[in-house]
């Protein structure tokens, strides 16, 4: 199960990156049950609205993700995110599908 965060391009990308990589990601790393985090920067928009970053946070299953969302660590990370990314963030839960 994945928690996916999509970020619109911030007004000040350098300040966003500093807050995100120096503070936010270390806070997220403390969330119980989080197995892996992958951050991708978008380099080209082919169709639709452009985005800045995508972060995929991997959890072993939905129950673990649900539990993680209720932890003090996730609350702290969420409060931190709101301090610099208000209005820029879309959060999604995604389940990996088997290959066809």
Roles of regions detected by a PLM:
Residues 1-100:
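Macromolecular interaction modules
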């Amino acid at each position: 199960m994945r928690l996916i965060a999509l970020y619109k391009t911030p007004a000040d990308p350098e300040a966003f990156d500093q807050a995100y990589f120096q503070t936010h990601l270390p806070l997220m790393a403390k969330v119980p049950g989080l197995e892996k985090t992958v951050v991708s920067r978008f380099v080209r928009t082919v169709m639709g609205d452009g985005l800045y970053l995508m972060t995929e946070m991997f959890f072993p299953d939905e129950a673990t993700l649900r539990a993680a969302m209720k932890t003090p660590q996730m609350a702290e990370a969420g409060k931190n995110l709101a301090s610099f990314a208000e209005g820029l963030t879309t959060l999604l839960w995604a389940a990996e599908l088997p290959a066809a």
